């Protein structure tokens, strides 16, 4: 390989790497990369990642955690984890995908074959997410369709599904006494449990299939399929709408929320700092797990999306911007949620602690109840559930896309052919839909809670995050990875990122992981229903099935490799030689930088080709 310098008439000298005579480029490899596809532009990548990480948790989990854990004081542990775990691991996964141009499994296999189980574990978590996360979209679609009525069906107690215990608060506020309130239920709760879920007495009784929910689930899967069936070329176009539309809805709901009576009191409850809460280790655990949940860390999605970037894309700048965007969205969503909860508390004459909810309880009980108290309630109901649908939709189809990417990179000769991608997505969609039918039975809510509590729990994500940063910083080498990043973006990231990879992130993850185990409490539905022992066994199977991949594949790869233990260990911790190596740049002042070989660009390296921090 020879370095040649050309001096154009109207520009600076250009330095490129060209093959010497007789030296051939790997045409087959180029075709494979070309077939794999890339983002058309940076905005498609940014919006796709934003769509993945900014989801339902920003609206229904973060505001409640902030209120529950000391209001404004919660931001102290939150931002400690944000800078020491969130940004470093987020950037690590995106940079890994961009550097290797591979999905989650093959990226880790190329970096360190011994720890390829990290990628397989993320695929297991992705698979679980694809089965149960989309159920929320089915519920939201059901509520959206139910909102197109002259009167919202969860407003009154005169419907066929209501019981004699139903009490409409708005029309009978003076009829209920303190001694009898426990015997009554609200029309909102009865609509949720009796009309939507048809919930049974426990997981032992799954009951019949809720056909309306099954059809809503089918519609959700059809939308997801056609959003991604042609690869990143279609996904990149769809996210222009799906990732930005929720922000429009959020702004509209924010304006409406802060103009409601009682909104100010709700916001005060949301932000009022209680520094004494920082003494509680649970507050710190909630902050850490929220970072991992909301940043989609250890799910393989960031690696897969980063793998479609151009080699010299400034993924460092993108990662920092996306992390701040995610947290800012969570913060803004808190104003929407608590302004409306404050209004609802004032209307009912209740303390805000009695109306504050998180998770599905906020989306399908608290907020529907709030809109019944507003003028034009059907309009606000439609806007809210449309926002929920779009928040969940792009997270869902990006998650499916990442599973498809991982599969195609693992078996390129079989799957990267004409028409195979569409069939693979169809197979995944059909399988996940059929599996999801168990979650839209009358007892499906109990199964959904098991998936949500165990399959993608904070324990699983913390466990994988520890191995990710240990693999990159201690096995592959933090300095070596910094060299690779410098080769891609043109400069070395802030030293705190490397310090976090080496010490802070694994230390905090380990401490939070151990504390999570010590504070483990078995799942209870609505804090009342206790699962049978076999139900908890299913939950722990869901949790351990991902975590076991890491040690299991360490053992398998060691047993399959020949030679002494030391030789096998050295071989299995050696990166794939096909990975791009940092190259020697010729600078305009005649100096050179330390380097080893060409990077995988199609036209050669040109001075000024990289994005810079400027």
UniProtKB/Swiss-Prot annotation:
One GO cellular component term: basolateral plasma membrane
Pfam family, one: SNF
Cystine residue pairs: 157-166
Principal location class: membrane
Known catalytic reactions: 4-aminobutanoate(out) + chloride(out) + 3 Na(+)(out) = 4-aminobutanoate(in) + chloride(in) + 3 Na(+)(in); glycine betaine(out) + 2 chloride(out) + 3 Na(+)(out) = glycine betaine(in) + 2 chloride(in) + 3 Na(+)(in)
Membrane topology value: Multi-pass membrane protein
Compartment annotation: Basolateral cell membrane; Cell membrane
Gene Ontology biological process terms, A to Z: amino acid transport; gamma-aminobutyric acid transport; glycine betaine transport; neurotransmitter transport; sodium ion transmembrane transport
Compositionally biased intervals (Basic and acidic residues): 21-33
Keyword presence, Acyltransferase: no
Record function comment: Transporter that mediates cellular uptake of betaine and GABA in a sodium- and chloride-dependent process. May have a role in regulation of GABAergic transmission in the brain through the reuptake of GABA into presynaptic terminals, as well as in osmotic regulation. Probably also involved in renal and hepatic osmotic regulation.
Assembly, per entry: Interacts with LIN7C.
Protein name listed in UniProt: Sodium- and chloride-dependent betaine transporter
Underlying gene: SLC6A12
């Amino acid at each position: 390989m020879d370095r040649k310098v050309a001096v154009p008439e109207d520009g600076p000298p250009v330095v490129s790497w060209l093959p010497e005579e007789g030296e051939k480029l790997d045409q087959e490899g180029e075709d494979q990369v070309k077939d794999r596809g890339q983002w058309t532009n940076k905005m498609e990548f940014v919006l796709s990642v934003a769509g993945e990480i900014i989801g339902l948790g920003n609206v229904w989990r973060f505001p409640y955690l902030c209120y529950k854990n000391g209001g404004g004081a919660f931001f102290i542990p939150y931002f400690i984890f944000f800078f020491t775990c969130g940004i470093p691991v987020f950037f690590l996964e995106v940079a890994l995908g961009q550097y290797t141009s591979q999905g989650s499994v093959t990226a880790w296999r190329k970096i360190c074959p011994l720890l390829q189980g990290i990628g397989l574990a993320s695929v297991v978590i992705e698979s679980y997410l694809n089965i149960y996360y989309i159920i929320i979209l089915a519920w939201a679609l059901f509520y959206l369709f139910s909102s197109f009525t002259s009167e919202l069906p969860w407003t009154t107690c005169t419907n066929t599904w209501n019981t004699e215990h139903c009490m409409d608060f708005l029309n009978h506020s003076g009829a209920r006494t303190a001694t009898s309130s426990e015997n009554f239920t609200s029309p909102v709760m009865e609509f949720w449990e009796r009309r939507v879920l048809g919930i049974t007495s426990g997981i032992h009784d799954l009951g019949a299939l809720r056909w309306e929910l099954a059809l809503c689930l089918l519609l959700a899967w059809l939308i997801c399929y056609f959003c991604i069936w042609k690869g990143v070329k279609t996904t990149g176009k769809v996210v222009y709408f799906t990732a930005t539309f929720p922000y429009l809805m959020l702004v509209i709901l924010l304006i409406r929320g802060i103009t409601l009576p009682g909104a100010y009191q709700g916001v005060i409850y949301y932000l009022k700092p209680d520094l004494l809460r920082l003494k509680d280790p649970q507050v710190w655990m909630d902050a850490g797990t929220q970072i991992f949940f909301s940043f989609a860390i250890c799910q393989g999605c960031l690696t897969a999306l980063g793998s479609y970037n151009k080699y010299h894309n400034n993924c460092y700048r993108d990662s920092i911007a996306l992390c701040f965007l995610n947290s800012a969205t969570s913060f803004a969503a808190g104003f929407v949620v608590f302004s409306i909860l404050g209004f609802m508390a004032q209307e009912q004459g209740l303390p805000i602690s009695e109306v504050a909810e998180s998770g599905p309880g906020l989306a399908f009980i608290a907020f529907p109840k709030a809109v019944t108290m507003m003028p034009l309630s059907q309009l606000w109901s439609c806007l809210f559930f449309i926002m929920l649908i779009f928040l969940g939709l792009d997270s869902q189809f990006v998650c499916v896309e990442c599973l498809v990417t991982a599969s195609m990179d693992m078996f390129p000769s079989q799957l990267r052919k004409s028409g195979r991608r569409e069939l693979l997505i169809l197979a995944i969609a059909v399988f996940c839909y059929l599996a999801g039918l168990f979650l839209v039975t009358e007892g499906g809510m109990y199964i959904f809670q098991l998936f949500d509590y165990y399959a993608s729990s904070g324990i699983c994500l913390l466990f994988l995050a520890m191995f990710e940063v240990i693999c990159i910083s201690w096995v592959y080498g933090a300095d070596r990875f910094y060299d690779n990043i410098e080769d891609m973006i043109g400069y070395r990231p802030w030293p705190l990122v490397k310090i976090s990879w080496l010490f802070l992130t694994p230390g905090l993850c380990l401490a939070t992981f151990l504390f999570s185990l010590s504070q483990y409490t078995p799942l209870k539905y609505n804090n009342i229903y206790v699962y049978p022992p076999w139900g908890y066994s299913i939950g722990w199977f869901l949790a351990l099935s991902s975590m076991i991949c890491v040690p299991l594949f360490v053992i398998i790869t060691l047993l399959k490799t020949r030679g002494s233990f030391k030789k096998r260990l050295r071989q299995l911790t050696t990166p794939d030689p096909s990975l791009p190596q940092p190259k020697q740049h010729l600078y305009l002042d005649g100096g050179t930088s330390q380097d080893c070989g060409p990077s995988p660009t199609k036209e050669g390296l040109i001075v000024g080709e990289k994005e810079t921090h400027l």
